[in-house]
Amino acid sequence: MLALGLLLALPTQAAEQRVYLVATMQLDGSSLAQSIFLHEPGITELEGCREAVRAGQRDRDWQRYHHIFRSDRFKGFSGHMQYRCAISDQQFSSWQDGPRYNRSYLIGVDEHSKLNVERTSSQAQCMTQLRALPAARQAHRFCAMGNQQIMP
């Protein structure tokens, strides 16, 4: 009984659900992509994220989830941006735009907008893991390089 009381007395901390904007630049005609995970503390609902995306695309001025697509870095190539709003209990280091997108991730956003990010050893390993999934799960996942860390 004492052991049970001690277990109940231990502080427990539920994982905090956060709303993220997953912004992905996909190089057209390839599997190469870069993704960033942006969090705005003032946005706590998916609809708030979606509205921020609509406003950012419409006004071409990202007041929320501030980022800049540097098309000048892709001379001779074409790519497109894809935005997904998602909820996750995972946390990521803050994003700083820079040249080192050297972390490979298998990223999933399911039909309920639940974000799951897994670190893989390489882009090739990520593609191997992705192809091993059933088709229904593959449809909600992709591989991308990032420069943020998954926080413990």
Task: Label each residue range with its predicted role.
Residues 14-152:
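Mitochondrial intermembrane space
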